[in-house]
């Protein structure tokens, strides 16, 4: 059932709807307040039940269902917008790739307030990344040439002893797994 107000005056209750036709099944991870994954595996056209969130300012990463690739990042300034005690709906809308969709509107997150009116666009934030360089310095003959993987995705093939990769971007503040296998 739809809500017009939060179940607690200190919270903002948020209903989430996935309405972006070219976006994959996604997770939403909150990265500023440490809330972690708040929406898990939501496909296009589905709703996630109400999230009863303490009214605060959040930073939301939209990730693929595996949680490894960040598609976009948005601010959700619930406290700044003084939304305590309210219930609202956040919709993912638009296209991740507008060029493949007749130049349609770009992907974004929008808030429908209980009072109605024009949807409120959540601000896009820069995706946090870290610069990583891989250096092969293992003198073991069995590891003279190796393949390097980042989160189960091939990163470097045929990587030789005493070589260094160029710097690459990796998710900042995230745990990731680096795998090494014989080439």
Segment roles from a protein language model:
Residues 1-183:
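Intrinsically disordered, low-complexity polar regions and short flexible loop motifs
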């Amino acid at each position: 059932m739809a809500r017009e107000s939060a179940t607690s005056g200190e919270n903002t209750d948020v209903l989430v709807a996935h309405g972006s036709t070219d976006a994959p099944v996604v997770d939403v991870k909150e990265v500023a307040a440490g809330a972690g994954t708040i929406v898990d595996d939501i496909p296009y056209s589905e709703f996630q039940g109400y999230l009863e969130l303490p009214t605060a300012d959040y930073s939301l990463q939209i990730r693929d269902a595996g949680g490894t690739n960040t598609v976009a990042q948005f601010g959700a300034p619930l406290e700044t917008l003084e939304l305590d005690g309210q219930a609202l709906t956040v919709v993912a809308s638009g296209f991740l790739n507008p060029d493949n969709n007749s130049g349609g509107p770009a992907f974004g997150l929008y808030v429908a307030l209980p009072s109605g009116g024009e949807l409120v666009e959540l601000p896009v934030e820069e995706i946090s990344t870290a610069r990583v360089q891989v250096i092969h310095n293992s003198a073991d003959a069995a590891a003279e040439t190796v393949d390097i993987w980042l989160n189960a995705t091939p990163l470097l093939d045929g990587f030789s002893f005493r070589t260094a990769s160029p710097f690459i971007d990796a998710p900042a503040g995230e745990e990731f797994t680096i795998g090494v296998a014989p080439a």
